[in-house]
Regions:
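Catalytic adenosine-cofactor/nucleotide-binding cores of aminoacyl-tRNA synthetases and other
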Residues: 1-187
Length: 187
């Protein structure tokens, strides 16, 4: 309805802008969609230096609902990052979201501190523990499938729309043999 109203009524053929549709979708789903991490192929495993593990990282399910927490258990000092994030930021200071500030090197990330104010200018990267077993397949808007790993809490979101942080919104359709099946819904 909002899309039709935004175009106005006239006798000319209407051209629908996908950007307008995505913007309207975001307004509708953003207030309720919980946030999670997913790391898509290809990804790389990196070792974390100077970080005490095991560690439980607590993140908000939604930035406006501070009482709803999700946890990521980091049992060993290894995480996976998407290969393009790793390559684009190698040699730079980065923020691994919820985990801390690091200098990203060749095959490793060295913990420097947890100063969030300092990290404002850093690239903020999503990550998952290297021992993550939950897989995800997302049917993309162009019909292709994205394969990757997903945060464990996504198992509780079947039939809901979620935001995969730094990626897109998708609807978690089902869970089959330790693999979540999802459909892309909006940027």
């Amino acid at each position: 309805k909002q899309l039709v109203l935004s175009m106005g009524i006239n006798t000319n053929d209407a051209i629908i802008s996908m950007e307008n549709l995505y913007a309207i979708n975001r307004k509708l789903i953003d207030p309720t969609a919980n946030r999670y991490f997913a790391v898509f192929e290809p990804y790389v495993k990196i070792t974390l230096k100077n970080l005490a593990v095991p560690k439980v990282v607590q993140l908000y399910k939604h930035p406006n609902r501070k009482n709803e927490i999700r946890e990521i258990k980091l049992n060993k000092a290894e995480v996976v990052l998407e290969k393009n994030d790793y390559e684009a930021n190698s040699g730079k200071e980065i923020r691994l979201m919820g985990l801390g500030n690091f200098v990203l090197g060749k095959g490793f990330a060295e913990f420097t501190d947890n100063d969030l104010a300092k990290a404002k200018g850093f690239p903020h990267l999503h990550w998952l523990p290297s021992d993550t077993e939950l897989k995800i397949t997302v049917l993309n808007e162009d019909g292709s499938e994205l394969q990757g790993l997903a945060e464990t809490g996504l198992k509780d979101e079947v039939s809901k729309v979620v935001q995969l942080e730094r990626k897109f919104f998708c609807k978690i359709e089902s869970m089959e043999n330790s693999t979540l099946k999802a459909i892309y819904t909006s940027k």
